[in-house]
Design a protein with these regions (language model features):
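Intrinsically disordered, low-complexity cytosolic terminal tails
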Residues: 1-54
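Helix-loop boundary elements of multi-pass alpha-helical membrane proteins
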Residues: 48-90, 301
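Signal-peptide-cleavage-adjacent N-terminal segments of secreted and extracellular proteins
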Residues: 81-172
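Hydrophobic/aromatic-rich, well-ordered segments within soluble, folded domains that form packed cores
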Residues: 131-153, 288-312, 502-505, 685, ...
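Active-site-proximal beta-strand/loop segments in catalytic clefts of secreted hydrolases
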Residues: 145, 278, 597-599
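Short secondary-structure subsegments characteristic of cysteine-rich extracellular domains
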Residues: 159-181, 317-337, 615-621, 723-727
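Intrinsically disordered, low-complexity linker/terminal regions across diverse proteins
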Residues: 170, 327, 333, 353-369, ...
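Noncatalytic, helix-rich "gating/capping" subdomain that lines the substrate-entry/channel surface
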Residues: 176-488, 525-527, 537, 542-559
Length: 790
């Protein structure tokens, strides 16, 4: 509920944690057992074998060969050059003979297919072929067919939990941002871009960070009344309530503990900003880590992590162990009373609008006025309207707080702030975090410092970084192309809408109106090109070159201020809610807009040199995916103006739910054998519906383009039609693999299905795919029973 948009085409936190390491051509892959995805009724399933990641062992056979050539003596080099010259001459003669032979036969042969032989086409064909496993049967396992070689040649780096084409693109983007942020200040810079460069520079200044140490963190904890576990037996509760402490964390450090709070559009009145409350996000990736016996090792690692950090700050180890046992018990209780995410998809069912007086009456265990007034500058009255999304949780949480001693509460509340700061710490603190993440995510080491600093700068000053990025790294023609593709894909959606027989005519007409009313945001907001307006964005943010941790704390205060200042102001529906330099896309239900940042308008998704089949199979499917989000299990609850209301009649709602349940059941039968877990089809249904709808709409739009412009020349050496290339490029977006620990985390906490499932699920539902690859009915990729919503 906290974000104004859906979770994006791909969860961002996965992207920014990645890097690419590729094995040389011809390299042997360490023998491993394959990662298996099974599909079928639970307990009895057919098995689809997917290539398991070969691990972190790297052999560089290609490099070895090159080195041996460079070490040859002069005589050997001359001999080698002679052999190469003869070989080249023979090859040229062979090609000339072939050309002559083909020319002589032109009068008797049928016309050959039109093949594109430009440099761009050759490069594109080579890229597609280099990822494929041509020995795999496309109608049995299209993921292996499309991605088998890519997965075999790309190892998961030690500092990553997964590797994928998405993540490789994000890493390429990071390299560009690194170069931009390291450029000296120049005449084109403004106050905002200078702050971004200063933040990055302070992040890279390790000697200065080491000199300052953890002093800013210690001062912060002291300001908040002291961390009891570190202060020791002499700690006394501060002369203010727990609610005031929670309010200070929210207002000063943008940290939500025990509950989440933000200011945003009212779901039932999207033009008005309102105070909103929701249940807390637990410290570990999902509530399951606290409640399932199978996660005891991760929970123990979490306890060890918090203990080690407290000891580094001066706590007695034995005391810390005992006190954090009580903290873990508290967080277990909070996790237990929280509502599972897959039970929160019906926004209208959990939405509750009430006044502060009503909230206080229904949840009397908490002093709500004290909490809110601590971080809201203007007076709060008992009539202040509030939207709450977790009333049952608040009731239970209030009771837990009442029966928990102040020392344990303060230990937990301040630990959550400390934990959020830990990624920015170095040396011993960093090492303890690495040890924890090794157990939780399988990550064996920390990333390069520059990569971390680029990520943090882009996250914390995203618009300033975006302004730097678009100067020289964004092809403005791609914006016009994307707009045209959005138009054609929206037309395809409306055609499919007209053809479906489960909606009544009135609802269908309203749905078409909503689709046509969607606003599209492509590339970046226009104000990034206006230095004065851009500088206003960060006028309240103070950044210095040589105080990194102080800068981090300043950004947290700025983020809190930036959000809270919207209270009682009308919603700016033209304002972007994401930074431009990110490989992702979004749909915002309260604004009914689709957002495609500059970072995603690059290969594999889009290139001006790609044939249309690849662009429609790439960014086209992304466009269709985001359009479909307006009509998935959550988006369908909002009208064209972004207001939550019932604009479907009951018969149509029932028909939708039946089709959505088909998707839920289908995806719930996919099982990742390596972690022995099924996909949560209920939690991932919105993204799965969008994947299926986006694929169908984009292919229809592509075929309409072909009917107008004709077939494009084929790509050389691939031996695939453009219909086949459309689906191949879609699948190769999802090439990748992940560690078992990461697979477990994603299944438990992510609204997105893992990459292989995002290939196998939509394609096995697609009649267009089955025709393109001539898959027999009943084959794994062309089952007789298919699911279809949009």
């Amino acid at each position: 509920m906290k974000a104004e948009s859906n979770n994006g085409y791909l969860k961002t936190s996965v992207i920014v944690e990645q890097n690419e390491i590729s094995l040389g051509s011809g390299q042997e892959t360490p023998a491993t057992s394959p990662l298996q995805v099974t599909y079928g009724p639970r307990g009895s399933a057919t098995t689809t074998v997917l290539q398991k990641h070969p691990g972190n062992r790297r052999k560089s056979l290609g490099i070895t060969r090159a080195t041996s050539i460079r070490r040859r003596g002069p005589a050997n080099r001359q001999q080698l050059l002679g052999v190469l010259a003869v070989t080249l001459l023979a090859t040229c003669l062979f090609i000339l003979l072939l050309l002559a032979l083909n020319t002589s036969r032109e009068c008797v042969q049928e016309p050959r297919p039109n093949v594109c032989m430009t440099e761009e086409c050759i490069r594109t064909a080579a890229s597609l072929l280099s990822a494929m496993d041509r020995t795999a049967a496309p109608c049995v396992n299209f993921f292996q067919y499309a991605c088998g070689t890519w997965n075999r040649r790309h190892v998961i780096p030690e500092d990553r939990s997964s590797i994928s084409t998405f993540e490789v693109l994000a890493n390429q983007l990071q390299v560009i941002l690194k170069r931009i942020l390291e450029e000296p200040p120049n005449n084109e810079d403004n106050n905002a871009t200078l702050k971004a460069k200063m933040f990055y520079k302070s992040c890279m200044d390790i000697p200065r960070i080491r000199e300052i140490g953890d002093i800013p963190l210690r001062k912060t904890l002291e300001f908040l009344g002291g961390w009891p576990v570190v202060v020791g037996p002499s700690w006394k509760p501060p002369p203010y309530s727990v609610e005031v402490l929670l309010g200070r964390l929210r207002g000063q450090y943008n940290e939500g503990v025990l509950l989440e709070q933000w200011v945003g559009p009212d779901d039932k009145n999207s033009s008005a900003n309102i105070l909103q409350l929701d249940q807390m996000q637990v410290a570990l990736p999902s509530r399951d880590y606290y409640l399932k016996k199978s996660s005891e090792s991760q929970l123990h690692a979490y306890h060890r992590y918090m203990t080690n950090i407290a000891v580094l700050m001066g706590a007695n180890r034995q005391t810390a162990v005992e006190e954090f046992n009580r903290v873990i018990n508290l967080e277990k209780q909070l996790a237990n009373v929280s509502i599972p995410e897959d039970d929160r998809h019906d926004t209208s069912a959990i939405y509750r609008k009430l006044t502060l007086r009503e909230l206080q009456r229904e949840i009397p265990q908490l002093k709500w006025h004290e909490y809110l007034q601590e971080f809201i500058n203007s007076p709060i009255t008992e009539e202040e309207p509030i939207v709450a999304y977790a009333m049952p949780y608040f009731m239970q949480m209030g009771r837990i707080v009442k029966r928990t001693d102040r020392r344990t509460l303060h230990n937990y509340i301040l630990w959550r702030l400390v934990m959020s700061i830990m990624p920015h710490m170095i040396d011993e603190y960093q090492q303890k975090r690495v040890e924890f993440r090794k157990i939780l995510l399988g990550i064996l080491s920390e990333r390069d410092r520059w990569s971390q600093c680029v990520e943090w700068t882009n996250k914390k000053l995203g618009m300033a970084v975006g302004a730097l990025f678009i100067r020289d790294n964004f092809n403005h023609e791609s914006k016009e192309t994307a707009l045209e593709m959005i138009r054609t894909i929206r037309e395809a959606f409306n055609e499919l809408l007209a053809e479906n027989h489960w909606m009544d005519n009135e609802t269908r007409a309203v749905a078409k109106n909503k689709a046509n009313s969607m606003n599209e945001r492509i590339g970046y907001p226009e104000f990034l090109k206006d230095p004065v307006e851009l500088s206003k964005e960060y006028v309240m943010l103070n950044i210095t070159e040589n105080h990194f941790l102080e800068n981090v704390l300043a950004v947290l205060r700025y983020d809190a201020y930036h959000n809270l200042e919207k209270l009682r102001k009308p919603v700016d529906k033209d304002k972007w809610s994401t930074e431009p330099a990110v490989v992702n896309a979004f749909y915002n239900p309260n604004k009914n807009d689709i957002v495609f940042p500059a970072g995603i308008l690059q290969p594999l998704f889009y290139s001006q040199h790609f044939p249309k089949s690849l662009n429609y199979g790439g960014i086209g499917v992304v466009i269709g995916h985001e359009i479909t989000h307006g009509f998935d299990d959550k988006g369908r609850q909002f009208d064209k103006d972004g207001n939550m209301m019932q604009w479907w009649n009951n018969v149509t709602v029932k028909a939708f739910r039946e089709r959505a349940q088909c998707i839920v059941d289908q995806y719930s039968r996919y099982k990742l054998q390596e972690v022995d877990l099924y996909i949560n089809g209920k939690m991932t249904q919105g993204e799965n519906i969008a994947d299926n709808g986006g694929l169908k709409q984009s292919f229809r739009a592509y075929k309409k383009w072909v009917s107008i412009h004709g077939e494009e020349p084929l790509l050389p050496g691939v031996n695939l039609t453009h219909d086949q290339l459309f689906f191949l490029n879609y699948a190769q977006i999802w090439c990748g693999s992940m560690r078992p620990e990461d697979a477990l985390t994603k299944i438990r906490s992510s609204v997105h299905s893992p990459g292989p499932i995002r290939v196998l699920g939509p394609l096995s539902n697609s009649e267009d795919f089955a025709r393109a690859y001539d898959c027999p009915p009943g084959s794994p990729m062309n089952p007789t029973q298919k699911c279809n919503v949009w």
